[in-house]
A protein has these predicted regions:
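Conserved beta-ketoacyl condensing-enzyme motif
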Residues: 23-113, 118-135, 191-214, 287, ...
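Active-site-proximal alpha-helical scaffold in enzymes
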Residues: 88-118, 157-186, 256-263, 328, ...
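Glycine-rich loop/linker segments at domain edges
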Residues: 16-18, 102-160, 222-224
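N-terminal extracellular/periplasmic Venus flytrap/periplasmic-binding protein-like
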Residues: 11-13, 24, 28-33, 44, ...
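Active-site pocket-lining segment
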Residues: 187-190, 200, 277-346
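Conserved catalytic cysteine-centered active-site region
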Residues: 25, 57-111, 132, 144-151, ...
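Condensing-enzyme catalytic core mediating Claisen C-C bond formation in acyl metabolism
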Residues: 1-27, 225-291, 295, 302, ...
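Short, well-ordered amphipathic alpha-helical segments that serve as non-catalytic structural scaffolds
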Residues: 27-43, 68-72, 97, 149-156, ...
Length: 394
């Protein structure tokens, strides 16, 4: 089996949706500008040698339709030789693409692939424009297949006995860690600044345009505290415990990695950053989809012949406080190595981008801590879990 090495990894900052900093930036623009920056750092690579662009996206329709991966390839690489394919495993889409690219290179089916994800929840709302559940499935008593994510978070909170107080405290810590990380410049080296052009009518009714650059995650709040979080009302269930404050944010963002074969790495004299050791997905009941990592993490560890104690850092996607705490408690995970710079509750969750975004963040922190093994894991809508183990090489 050949080796597949991650040699570059970048992301955009994450903007709030639907009225945040990227509300005027199309997803294909976000992604193509990120890829363009990443490839510019490897001038010795002939772009026509890239075998594929694999893009994760959770809602591939409208501005994210038309096989957005191919659109991104054309816009970002500015050559017609490189194909593109869009992949949807919902919240795990970005991580799935890294696994697919690594597997193709290891098997000899490719030498160089761009993998990652993009999501604009400003342009495409949660669930898309027209979700039509199968009436026959609902008739069979399986309506939970289509439950909204918030309702599943309530179910997890109830089943795993996660209190409102614990959820709010977890959310607060996510913001505190993220604000601290930003103040220390921890994300600067991984973020590609994106220029946004905003056109509007001024007070005189005249058309004006202004440009601004986005290089900092928009979500983390310095002013949040437990008192404010405790005041928020449940939004998914009467007398529930899941609020806007202890749930992940709707977001816009893009993240990508460049993966090469060992042969190409040597030929181009490039120093690898990391490699994917193993990847696993698992199915769980849709009504408690948030527990997905409880099944996926042991599975990937077994495949890799590793133990949880071998993992030095974990990026656990914080879809909701309730499910994050359920996973941590059920698997008895070490809280000190999880989301050390904050998670999706503070930093945002741009669905199909998140798996790649968390991987980029993981590599950056592994470099700083000189860690050897790291993990990216998340729950996935409709009852799935995903987990990937990375080895840091630099």
């Amino acid at each position: 089996m050949k080796e597949a090495y991650i040699v570059k990894a970048y992301r955009t900052a994450v903007g709030k949706a639907p009225k945040g900093l990227f509300r005027f930036k199309r997803p294909d623009e976000l992604a193509s500008e990120t890829i363009n920056h990443m490839i510019s750092e490897v001038p010795q690579l002939d772009k026509t040698r890239i075998d594929d662009v694999i893009v994760g996206n959770a809602t591939p329709e409208a501005e994210q339709g038309l096989n957005i991966a191919r659109v991104i390839s054309l816009m970002g690489l500015k050559v017609e030789d490189v194909p593109g394919v869009t992949v949807n495993r919902y919240c795990a889409s970005g991580l799935e693409t890294i696994a697919m690219a690594s597997a193709k290179i290891k098997s000899g089916m490719a030498e160089c692939i761009i993998a990652g994800g993009v999501e604009s929840m400003s342009f495409i709302p949660m669930g898309g424009y027209k979700t039509v559940p199968d009436y026959g499935i609902a008739k069979q008593g399986k309506e939970d297949y289509y439950w909204g994510m918030g309702l599943t978070a309530e179910q997890v909170a109830e089943q795993y006995k996660v209190s409102r107080e614990d959820q709010d405290e977890f959310a607060l810590n996510s913001h505190l860690k993220a604000v601290d990380a930003i103040s220390k410049g921890k994300f600067k080296s991984q973020i590609v600044p994106i220029t946004v052009e905003e056109t509007f009518l001024n007070q005189n009714g005249q058309k004006e345009t202004k440009n601004y650059s986005v290089d900092t995650d928009q979500g983390p709040r310095k002013d949040t505290n437990l008192k404010l979080l405790n005041k928020l009302r449940p939004v998914f269930k009467m007398n529930g415990s899941v609020t806007a404050g202890n749930s992940s944010q709707m977001s816009d963002g893009a993240a990508f990695v460049l993966i090469m074969s060992e042969k190409m790495v040597k030929e181009l004299n490039i120093e690898p950053i990391a490699k994917l050791v193993n990847y696993a997905v698992a199915g769980v009941p849709p009504k408690i989809m948030g527990i997905g990592p409880i099944k996926a993490i042991p599975k990937v560890l077994k495949q890799a012949d590793m133990k949880i104690d071998d993992i030095n850092l974990i990026e656990l996607n914080e879809a909701f406080s309730s499910q994050s705490l359920a996973v941590i408690r059920e698997l008895d995970l070490n809280k000190d190595i999880i989301n050390v710079n904050g998670g999706a509750i503070a930093l945002g969750h741009p669905l199909g981008c998140s798996g790649a975004k968390l991987s980029v963040q993981l590599f950056s922190e592994m470099r700083e801590r000189k860690s050897k093994y790291g993990m990216v894991t998340m729950c996935v809508g409709a009852g799935q879990g995903a987990a990937g183990i990375f080895e840091f090489l630099k």
